[in-house]
Amino acid sequence: MFGLSKVLRVGEGRAVKRLHKIADQVIALEEKFANLTDEELKAKTAEFKERIAGGEGLDEIFLEAFATAREASWRVLGQKHYRVQIMGGAALHFGNVAEMRTGEGKTLTCVLPAYLNALEGKGVHVVTVNDYLAKRDAEMVGRVHRYLGLEVGVILSDMRPDERRKAYTADITYGTNNELGFDYLRDNMARSLSDLVQRGHNYAIVDEVDSILIDEARTPLIISGPVDGTSQFYNVFAQIVPRMTKDVHYEVDERKKTVGVKEEGVEYVEDQLGIDNLYAPEHSQLVSYLNNAIKAQELFTRDKDYIVRNGEVMIVDGFTGRVLAGRRYNEGMHQAIEAKERVEIKNENQTLATVTLQNYFRLYTKLAGMTGTAETEAAELNQIYKLDVIAIPTNRPNQREDLTDLVYKTQEAKFAAVVDDIAERTEKGQPVLVGTVSVERSEYLSQLLTKRGIKHNVLNAKHHEQEAQIVAQAGLPGAVTVATNMAGRGTDIVLGGNPEILLDIKLRERGLDPFEDEESYQEAWDAELPAMKQRCEERGDKVREAGGLYVLGTERHESRRIDNQLRGRSARQGDPGSTRFYLSMRDDLMVRFVGPTMENMMNRLNVPDDVPIESKTVTNSIKGAQAQVENQNFEMRKNVLKYDEVMNEQRKVIYSERREILESADISRYIQNMIEETVSAYVDGATANGYVEDWDLDKLWNALEALYDPSINWTDLVEGSEYGKPGELSAEDLRTALVNDAHAEYAKLEEAVSAIGGEAQIRNIERMVLMPVIDTKWREHLYEMDYLKEGIGLRAMAQRDPLVEYQKEGGDMFNGMKDGIKEETVRQLFLLRKQFIKQDAEVAD
């Protein structure tokens, strides 16, 4: 009726107009649904499900379902969707990215499309950036869905498989991208149907979609298993490298994140190890240990790229400042850092299963996302995920003032000015949010603020447990919050304090829980929310008089989008607010891209350290550098996707066949085909030369005897009356005779096992043999594909396209793996046949 599926294919301007019309129609239903009793409103869910069962599509119940969820939100949460939130919800339902400014209520927006799509009973996944937000949204926003009779589940990192399975059977499931992706991988390693937890990939709404689908897309999800033994050379090189000198023994390219060992370095290492030639074949692994030790020393910084917690090296997400729990660098890099930090070196890991987030999210039948800043990555979202980005208008005009960047010569001068600015702002009651690029910088600034006696909260990878409480109070008068990258934090900073979160904290402190005792929680919520809102509003008025939230960035990020996300925390919902970045010539981005030119100019002009400059040249240089880095990162992600596409097609084939085997009660046809194809391959290999005289029959017979005990007489087969003289025996005759013989021998195994445990027993044995073989061969294939990819770049030196070569050789390896699965499965099953024969012989004796 609206041409709904085409809403965003008509140009953004016309799309927004259509979304406005949809919002008008939903709002027009407001009075009708407000007049319904609680029972009548709740009954709408059953009515919609009946209509869907009767053949109506989601688009036909769309307006009424949105109106139902909107009214339920008002009754349960005391919040009614604004026009722009209805528009955002519609954009999400159509499978697009809704770009909504910070503070416009993305979490509430999500209620509408989640409810509508859950009515089909196929499951809706709402994807957040961390466990806390998944749990918070499932509890808080999930109250609306539970009120309407839907089940809401949440996936958390510490959950058992049975808890996960129950959560996935819910109508709406909240979880992080990592947990959903790892569950997908674990499901495809399961040995029985009872071990599966997910039930398919129908519709996903990804919150902070740019953070998840772009920032984290370069890092694949990997389930690993330890490789026996840890090399002593990690510690050896962790001691050697600190004694080496940068630019003398080795060189570092910080922009490309690469290192190179110079001749002097090679000689130094050879001397330290007491060897003659570091590059001799027997020492080939040592070069890898050396390079990783140099990278650990020069390119990986503690409290920026990783933290050490409880004797464990934990990776920090460079974009969000969060700890990536369970992630480890591969190819020995993590072990090199562990050696550098002198903590326990854990075994190297072998990949058991892997998928990139790019390919995981492309599994969904329908995908949608929300973010505050997506326009800079709109092309990438469309090109890779086929997602269109539509900018949803703000509910009120934006009043934010973005002040000019201030550039200082040194870091020390910059941070001194930052502290002065913070002190001045807090004195007049203005809250300040300070963005830093690393844990190290946030703690350094915290020390400076403490010395000045300025009270503040720190929000970084080390304190994420207190994140909600800190952010909920970041809008209080005079509050100072130091944050490591506010990207993906997921909680609004409300002037005067966030009443909903502050009340939730208060109720939980009293022992009330929205999951455990929803009725008591809701009763207290309804009674106390008005007073909490009034208290926060009164404090908010004071903050508005002081100028609103002031956002202060202490360094430019390499991505403009991350800078924009930080700025976007200010001036939400039409509030006043301002932002400013403080920079120094020693900042990472300035050192890498702006170079010494500007610093030399400042020195020539005798600019004092504590005097900043405001320069369009610097600002333009930064913008150019950011655009350059963004393009590099985009190319890297595209390249990752191109290579992973090869693995993805192979993964889909192997996982599909594996699932089919898992779900089949009888896999005997698979086994029969494997026997036929394996024996046929042996015959084809031996009879490749057309003439009988040239056949390698000895090789064929040896291979068959290694596979099973042929009952056919070889001499009779070749010279017997059935086929006449050797010259008259065709390869097809040979194949037919041997395949029939193998089938006959396998039938004896089936008969022997069935006599003991019935036919079901042999079918179970077939599955018990086949599944581990598939997993082992797939694991070996992943290792070989990794090895192939590492060296494939060298093909360019021979004027060959590395990607084409990777596709060709990877395809050949995959076919070889599939043949290996068949051969090994048949061999192991025939081993059982031999064991039965042996047992029968022992009984006879």
From Swiss-Prot:
- What are the EC numbers? 7.4.2.8
Against PROSITE patterns, the record matches this protein to: SECA (PS01312), SECA_MOTOR_DEAD (PS51196)
- Membrane topology value: Peripheral membrane protein
Record keywords, A-Z:
ATP-binding, Cell membrane, Cytoplasm, Membrane, Nucleotide-binding, Protein transport, Translocase, Translocation, Transport
Question: What SMART domains would the database entry show?
Answer: SecA_DEAD, SecA_PP_bind
Tell me the GO molecular function terms. ATP binding; protein-exporting ATPase activity
Residues reported in the UniProt entry to bind ATP? Q85, G103, E104, G105, K106, T107, D492
**Gene3D superfamilies per record:** Helical scaffold and wing domains of SecA (1.10.3060.10), P-loop containing nucleotide triphosphate hydrolases (3.40.50.300), SecA, preprotein cross-linking domain (3.90.1440.10)
User: Where is this gene product found?
Assistant: Cell membrane; Cytoplasm
User: Among its keywords, does the record have ATP-binding?
Assistant: yes
Q: Which NCBIfam families match?
A: PRK12904.1, secA
Subunit description: Monomer and homodimer. Part of the essential Sec protein translocation apparatus which comprises SecA, SecYEG and auxiliary proteins SecDF. Other proteins may also be involved.
The record's listing under PANTHER family reads: CHLOROPLAST PROTEIN-TRANSPORTING ATPASE, SECA INNER MEMBRANE COMPONENT OF SEC PROTEIN SECRETION SYSTEM
**Function description:** Part of the Sec protein translocase complex. Interacts with the SecYEG preprotein conducting channel. Has a central role in coupling the hydrolysis of ATP to the transfer of proteins into and across the cell membrane, serving as an ATP-driven molecular motor driving the stepwise translocation of polypeptide chains across the membrane.
Q: What is this protein called?
A: Protein translocase subunit SecA 1
Whichever gene encodes this chain, its name is: secA1
